[in-house]
UniProtKB/Swiss-Prot annotation:
Catalyses which reaction(s): 4-phospho-D-erythronate + NAD(+) = (R)-3-hydroxy-2-oxo-4-phosphooxybutanoate + NADH + H(+)
CDD domains: ErythrP_dh
Organism placement in taxonomy: Bacteria, Pseudomonadati, Pseudomonadota, Gammaproteobacteria, Enterobacterales
Subunit structure: Homodimer.
Protein name per the record: Erythronate-4-phosphate dehydrogenase
Record organism: Sodalis glossinidius (strain morsitans)
Amino acid sequence: MKILVDENMPYAEALFGRLGDVQTVAGRAIPAPALALADALMVRSVTRVDGALLDGSRVKFVGTATAGTDHVDEDWLAQAGIGFSVAPGCNAIAVVEYVFSALLWLAQRDGFALRDKTVGIVGVGNVGGRLQRRLNAFGVRTLLCDPPLAEAGAPGDWQPLETLVAEADVLTFHTPLTLAGRHATWHQVDEALLAALPAGRIIINACRGAVVDNAALLQALEGGKPLSVVLDVWEPEPALSLPLLARVDIGTAHIAGYTLEGKARGTTQVFDAYSAYVGSDERASLAALLPPPAVERIRLRGAIDEEALRLLSHLVYDVRRDDMQLRRVAGLPGEFDRLRKNYYQRREWSSLCVETDNSIGADALRQLGFQARPFAG
């Protein structure tokens, strides 16, 4: 079997090599000759998968090592009889920790306590649900908005977006991009929402760029609207708005979900799905793939307060590093994608074991995603 895999999927060449002949390709420019000979295609969100790409090929299976599927025409794949697999939740923890890193940095810079803020979460799926649980574990009040889940009768204290706009200090977006329908998310943050948003609010977008009307946001910021803005995704990509980047507080190159664990989960999930599809018993072990982290263990004494959490969070991942790197190269041809392709081995909080003399603090850290254990003395 001939298997094409995106060159930025970690461990993909070795894993899929167990099942066939592997060729790595650039996701934004898959060579037509390679595609013509492929039996399977493994992609990320940068590849649009539809009839224009695959019609006439012999591809029988597509896997996307991403949680979202708005880059895939699933209806066309089904009609063409092509198998399909996605990696739900693969990078959810990474995005949650990106949001925490950004909020803890803003709290330090602006002199507020995160526990004193109300965070409005728009989209309460794999990412939003995990974010809610971690924020609540840290004592932060959350407001939840997810109309499709509310209509489906899912348990939760669901609120309309207007309530979040009025009451939440932070609005963080974790929805798919949907262009039509009653619950379309395209330009969910538009000129009207920005006008209604009280001064001093924080907006975070780490889902899809077009959920926020970037032109309207730039106009609001240039007009003096006092907002703090964190953008990991842009409209469009990779040719993001340089004037908007200059105005936001944190800007990064669509890397919120780019932990080594998150990317490896995406690869292993689609590998397992394809292996089952072709009738193989081969399965991937995430733990066996991951290398030791740069910092494996740290010992703390005393209470685990917000400052301690900020230091621990930023020891593992400090969002300012990615902000600095994007600003350094923004506007240079190919550099947005180069940052993503050559992204360093960022780890998740679970890679760090915190030893503490505070048993209550150890429990809290475990709820937040760290390894933690008490010590005496």
